[in-house]
Regions:
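N-terminal Rossmann-like or analogous alpha/beta NTP/dinucleotide-binding catalytic cores
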Residues: 2-119
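Short secondary-structure capping/junction motifs at helix and strand boundaries
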Residues: 86-95, 113-126, 138-139, 153-154, ...
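Short, surface-exposed amphipathic charged segments that create phosphate/polyanion-binding patches used
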Residues: 107-110, 136, 298
């Protein structure tokens, strides 16, 4: 193995729906990084995969008269098939329903418990199933989350993580060079933490599609505790410690700006609690918009990446996505621009 390593990840993608060009963009960018560092001679590990637990997945399965596992199997295969068509060079495609992953999640939770950072209480507040996120009253406007997603009032017994214990440690981490980028995104999370952190509800009792909380079968773990830990599982945590030590900490978590808080606040705090080194950098890129709006199936402006490959060729699509959108910014997607870019360059 080379002494120089480069470990890059995409977020793992929800399986409540099929992949679209937003998923393709993140993964194409990550693939470009992976290819570049391999050409430099670095020992590269590129991880992607699917996020398969949570209320959103359970509800999507119910709507389609399927079991959650059936939905996960069907839609995870769609992501895997698309990535094969895109000729991506990922080293592993991880699924959070894998038994190996559950073992790693439970180990991280146990380490957080041993740190004294988990306690039982009652959660009352706003929750968005679409975002799989909790929101303060101050963040709700016209009955919706900042993302525009619908929210519901939740009151239930919950285990909490003492996120408030890690304000100073997080702020110190942000002061290190480029731990969160671009700079504007770092300033966002710094302001969020400086405003004071509430402890985080990390279990739910109103659905059962998830990893059961240890020693309390009425609770399942909050999907982000589960999902974020994939970055440890993917490089052998507990199962190949030599590989894990070789590649961790992660050099680059590449994420969309809508999930920055999870990766740049919750994730490093979980790692601090579990006595695991935090990542080197979290980079939040912008969104592909359609007529100024974020792409979503509910809005009917969803663009199928596979259809674009069929129509325009993989190289054309990949070049367009890397060339058209300034890295870190939002940009509007239009087929006319794709054709124009291809014909002019």
């Amino acid at each position: 193995m080379s002494d120089e390593t480069f470990y890059i990840t995409t977020p793992i993608y929800y399986v409540n729906g099929a992949p679209h060009i937003g998923h393709a963009y993140t993964t194409i960018v990550a693939d470009a990084f992976a290819r570049h560092y391999r050409q430099r001679g670095d020992d590269v590990f590129f991880l992607t995969g699917t996020d398969e637990h949570g209320l959103k997945v359970q509800r999507a399965a119910e709507e389609q008269d399927m079991s959650p596992q059936e939905l996960c199997d069907e839609n995870s295969a769609k992501f895997r098939d698309l990535f094969e068509r895109m000729e991506l060079t990922h080293d592993r495609f991880i699924r959070t329903t894998e038994e190996e992953h559950e073992e790693v999640v439970l180990d991280v939770v146990e380490r957080m418990k041993q740190s004294g950072d988990i306690y039982l209480d009652t959660y009352e507040g706003w929750y968005s199933a679409s975002d799989e996120a909790y929101y303060d009253e101050s963040e709700i406007e016209d009955g919706k989350a900042p993302s525009g997603s619908e929210v519901e009032w939740v009151e239930e017994e919950s285990y909490f993580f003492r996120l408030s214990n890690y304000e100073d440690e997080l702020l110190d981490w942000y002061e290190q060079d480029a731990t969160v980028a671009p700079e504007a995104r770092k300033n966002e999370v710094k302001s969020f933490v400086e405003g004071g952190l509430d402890d985080l509800s990390i279990t739910r009792t109103t659905f059962d599609w998830g990893i059961t909380y240890p020693d309390d079968p009425d609770h399942v773990l909050y999907v982000w505790v589960d999902a974020l830990t994939n970055y440890l599982t993917g490089i052998g945590r507990l199962h190949d410690e030599e590989m894990f030590e070789h590649f961790w900490p992660c050099d680059l978590h590449l994420v969309g700006k809508d999930i920055l808080r999870f990766h740049a606040v919750y994730w490093p705090a979980f790692l601090f609690s579990a006595d695991i080194e935090p990542p080197e950098q979290v980079f939040a890129h912008g969104w592909w918009l359609v007529e100024g709006e974020k792409m979503s199936k509910s809005k009917g402006n969803w663009v199928d990446a596979g259809e674009l490959i069929d129509q325009y060729d993989l190289d054309v699509l990949s070049y367009f996505m890397l060339r058209e959108l300034p890295f870190g910014n939002d940009g509007n997607f239009a087929k006319e621009r794709l054709v124009e870019r291809n014909n002019s360059e």
